[in-house]
């Protein structure tokens, strides 16, 4: 007996098979969305599958955001960042759903702890502690920070360390991506507690010269670098002294040389002899 092929029956079988594809779960990629700029977009790929892991091609998928103030999602699964915060995108097909967490971290400001800075003493140092925060006020732990000095002759920068080089004021800029934060830095000298002559010739002959060495000391007895001194002589007819502390013998006699620095002073006597 001859069997006849019935195309209507075949079509019914195909439709029945498709209708029997039950959605067991929804696979979402990426599993987590991370956004770092307002308006940044990431497209979610969602696929409904059966218990056997077979794709349900014509399954209807609906996307929804748990917080549209943080991130929105359109009907195709495109997620857009709005502001910093946490949200979740839910993909639903019938009674089955899946969630993809969304973390939006938009760097908004740099906070420098302890600013403005004052460095006391040449060579003194301070380590800068700065933090990048997003527009929700949360720390951005992955942010990288760089520092630069407007005047390296006053303050040098090594990594996050500031080093005093000369008396004065400058600015140090902390940078992270497009964010910048300037902080003023002042370098000053410690308070001078005493001034003393270190090198003084016992005598000078007329026509000879000598450099006087003077040191300023702090309350701890340590020498202070960078102190400027003013020199004077009690009698220029016997010996002169210039701004650098160079003494020149003029004629025989006794003279007093005075050095002043940081509101403190010291004196030393010098004898000038004939040639």
Residue ranges, per PLM feature:
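Extracytoplasmic soluble-region selector
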Residues: 3, 20-275
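Sec-dependent bacterial lipoprotein signal peptides
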Residues: 1-18
């Amino acid at each position: 007996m001859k069997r006849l092929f019935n195309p209507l029956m075949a079509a019914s079988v195909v439709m029945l098979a498709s209708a029997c594809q039950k959605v067991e779960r929804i696979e979402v990629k990426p599993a987590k969305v991370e956004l770092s700029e307002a308006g940044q977009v990431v497209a979610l790929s969602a696929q409904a599958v059966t218990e056997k892991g077979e794709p349900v091609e014509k399954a209807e998928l609906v996307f929804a955001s748990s917080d549209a103030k943080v991130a929105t999602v359109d009907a195709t699964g495109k997620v857009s960042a709005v502001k910093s915060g946490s949200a979740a995108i839910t993909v639903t097909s019938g009674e089955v759903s899946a969630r993809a967490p969304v973390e939006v971290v938009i760097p908004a400001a740099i906070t420098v702890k302890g600013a403005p800075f004052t460095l006391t003493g040449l060579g003194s140092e301070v380590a800068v502690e700065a933090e990048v925060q997003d527009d929700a006020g949360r720390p951005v732990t992955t942010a990288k920070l760089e520092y630069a000095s407007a005047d390296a002759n006053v303050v040098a920068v090594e990594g996050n360390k500031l080093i005093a080089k000369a008396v004065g004021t400058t600015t140090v800029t902390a940078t992270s991506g497009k964010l910048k934060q300037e902080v003023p830095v002042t370098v000053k000298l410690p308070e001078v507690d005493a001034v003393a002559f270190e090198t003084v010739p016992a005598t000078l002959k007329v026509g000879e010269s000598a450099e006087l060495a003077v040191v300023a000391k702090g309350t701890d007895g340590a020498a202070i670098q960078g102190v400027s001194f003013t020199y004077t002589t009690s009698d220029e007819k016997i010996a002169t002294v210039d701004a650098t502390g160079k003494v020149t013998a003029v004629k025989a006699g006794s003279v007093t040389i005075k050095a002043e620095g940081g509101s403190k002073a010291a004196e030393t006597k010098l004898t000038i002899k004939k040639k």
